[in-house]
A protein has these predicted regions:
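Charged, heptad-repeat coiled-coil alpha-helices that serve as long linker/dimerization "arms"
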Residues: 1-98
Length: 98
């Protein structure tokens, strides 16, 4: 920066880094929370997939419909979470390069 001494330049650069970090912090926190949520949902989906693959599971008339309903709910939630995850990923990438 012309007209700015080295110490002032370092101070301005540090301030810019701090502002950028403050801007990214909530996005990173939301991104991490969504990743955790996705992992939990994927684990639950895997468990339900195993249960639903067992023909004996359908002998209990009460559990099978509940499991099928929950599986469908998880699929819907995961679609939304992955979309949000992708949006946040794009926003973080753009914010990190500016």
């Amino acid at each position: 920066m012309p007209g700015v001494n080295r110490k002032e330049q370092r101070r301005l650069e540090a301030k810019a880094r701090e502002e950028k970090a403050a801007k990214l912090k909530p996005l990173k926190a939301e991104f991490a929370a969504i990743e955790i949520d996705i992992a939990k949902l994927e684990a639950e989906k895997a468990t339900l997939t195993q249960q639903l693959a067992d023909p004996g599971f359908f002998q209990d008339a009460g559990d099978a419909p509940k499991a099928m309903k929950r599986f469908s709910e998880i699929e819907t939630i995961l679609t939304i979470r992955y979309s949000k995850w992708g949006d946040l990923s794009d926003r973080l990438e753009k914010a990190d390069t500016t």
